[in-house]
Design a protein with these regions (language model features):
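Extracellular cell-wall/glycan-interacting regions and their flexible linkers
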Residues: 1-38, 179-238
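Peptidoglycan-targeting cell-wall enzymes and recognition modules
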Residues: 2-30, 45-162
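Alpha-helical scaffolds flanking conserved acidic
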Residues: 34-42, 161-169
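Charged, low-complexity, helix-prone segments enriched in Lys/Glu/Asp/Gln
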Residues: 70, 81-93, 178-196
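Intrinsically disordered, low-complexity polar segments enriched in Ser/Thr/Pro and acidic
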Residues: 106, 167, 235-238
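Short, hydrophobic/amphipathic alpha-helical patches that form generic packing surfaces
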Residues: 112, 169-173
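Residue microenvironments linked to proteolytic maturation
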Residues: 157, 163, 174-180
Length: 238
């Protein structure tokens, strides 16, 4: 495996370059659950498009977002003094000192919370609880199960074993986009999870037609007719 990067644009998670970067990102989080790894990577798909050199809107500017996680402002990451960073300072050419391995440095900065980006309340002040009421209610469930009731640490996140919850946690605690597009990121997380070797549970298929439960209020003669149609005597073997 090797890191890939380019001055502009992103990589599809099904492309050879995108897949290599997915595996490289996962390798930087050895202690995280598979669910947490998939959540981080899926969110980055919707941020920097799996391209470590990606500038927000494909326009260069230190006040803009940069990299896999769209560190904003870019200057916070680039001037952080973190060892081994190697950003590309252009959207049209490769600048001196730039290296695709900047992706690894970005992941290390994220995983160590080096820049203090983690918001443990798992919500953003610019997200209206009224507008996003169902998502706000889900936040409460997530914090009760995986956090400390009213907050969650990065260490607790890395131990999360629920893919949907992990995707929401990283979206809310680390990325914090203007619009919390959780549903689309959740779908991407399922794809990344499978790429990393996870198996998405398939809900059982109900009988066709469904067998009504005993005591459902349906007349006895109708229950018998349905049971006969399904070629079963389960309701009358008592």
């Amino acid at each position: 495996m090797t890191w890939h990067a380019k001055p502009s644009g992103g990589y599809s998670y099904t492309s050879a370059e995108g897949l290599d970067n997915i595996y490289e990102m996962a390798a930087t989080m050895p202690a995280a659950t598979l669910e947490a790894k998939a959540a981080v990577i899926a969110n980055s798909v919707h941020e920097g498009g799996l391209n470590p050199w990606r500038w927000q809107g494909d326009r260069y500017g230190m006040s803009r977002g940069y990299g896999l996680f769209q560190y904003t402002p870019a200057s916070g990451y680039i001037n952080s003094g973190y060892p081994s960073i190697a950003p590309n300072l252009s959207t049209t050419e490769i600048t001196a000192g730039a290296s695709p391995s900047d992706g690894e440095a970005q992941c290390e900065v994220m995983a160590s919370n080096y820049l203090g980006k983690w918001v443990s309340s798992c919500w953003r002040s610019y997200w209206s609880p009224t507008t996003y009421n169902s998502l706000y209610a889900y936040r409460g469930e997530v914090l009760r199960r995986w956090g400390s009731g009213s907050s969650i640490s990065m260490q607790q996140f890395f131990g999360c074993q629920d893919l949907d919850a992990a995707t929401f946690i990283f979206l809310a605690c680390f990325e914090g986009p203007a619009v919390p597009n959780y549903d689309v990121r959740k779908k991407t997380a399922a794809k990344i999870y499978e790429i990393l070797g996870g198996v998405i549970p398939v809900p059982p298929t109900p009988p066709d037609p469904p067998t009504p439960p005993v005591g459902s209020g349906i007349p006895f003669w109708l229950l018998k007719k349905i049971a006969d149609k399904n070629n079963t005597k389960r309701l009358f073997d008592l």
